[in-house]
Structure formats: structure tokens, C-alpha cells
């Protein structure tokens, strides 16, 4: 979390500075700064949350802001379409994360990372339950981190102003899925071994074909 906080704030600072000049002549200057500031706040909430609920609030925040930013020039049909594609695709991933949260709470009685991971490490989480949670979290990660088959929104994200592409692509939003799986590593370890193979295979196929 500390490392991600440094990365998010550093990248965001550079993007904000670049935006001052890049968007200076745009009539939506103030609106754009409001969006990227809210995006940064949401990303920090995502990486600093102590439990899955706070992380999910940040998760939804960056998803909503990505829609606002990608479709910023909404008078262009291509930008409006790209924004809607990003919004809908990420909702599929959100369904996966919500399902994982419900499963974790039903099994452990808490949404705290510490509580869930402790249960996974001490055998308090059955392998079948851990596998279900891991796979649903991976569905969420596929949406945010643009993995197959939910990668289709990312190329169209270029329809937004250049600072948007920098903020979304440069070690912030697209890394949030990887960050989530890393924080839940004990659950992945408690899951059936094939779950790791699924994650690795999808990642490799995304790298080759997406």
C-alpha cells in the first residue's frame, strides 16, 4: 500500500502539472481538474483501504472517473462511445469483486484484509471457498487491469485528453487489479492450484493477443 501510494501520488502530480498547460485553452479546464483530482482521491482510497469495502468504494470511484475522463469531449461520438464501453466493461468486473466480497463475508464474517488472510493462512477458509473468492477477485481484476476478455475498453481510452491516458495507463488504474490480488495472496495460496494456472494463462494470453 505504501509503495502504491507513492506511485499514485507521484504519477498524479506529474499529470496535474502537465495538464496545466495542455488544457489551458480548453473551456472545460476546471471540470477536467475536478475529475482528475477525484480520480486521484479514489485511487488513494483503493490502495489505502484496510478492508474490501473501502477498497470497493475507491474501486467504484476510479471506474466512474474513468468514464468522465475518457468521455470528457463527449460531443465527439467516438469519445462518448469509448466512455460508455469503459463504464459497462468495468461493471462486469465489479460484479466479480462484489461476489467475492459476499463470499468472504459469509465464510469469515469480516471484510478486513487481515481477517480474511488470517483465516486463509490458518485453515479457516476451505479450499473451495478460497478458490471461489480468488476467481471472483480475478474477474474484478480482469475488468480494471484490462485482461482478456475485458480488455476491450483500454485501447479506446485514448479518446480522452492525453493526461487521461497517462493517468489511467501509467501505473495507477490498470494496476489496481494486480494490487488487489497481491493483497489477497494468502487466499490465492489457499485456493486449488489450478486457480493460479488460470490467472497466469489469462495474463499470458493478454500479453500475446490483446
Where are these regions (language model features)?
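...captures the hydrophobic TM-helix bundle architecture rather than a specific catalytic motif
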Residues: 1-210
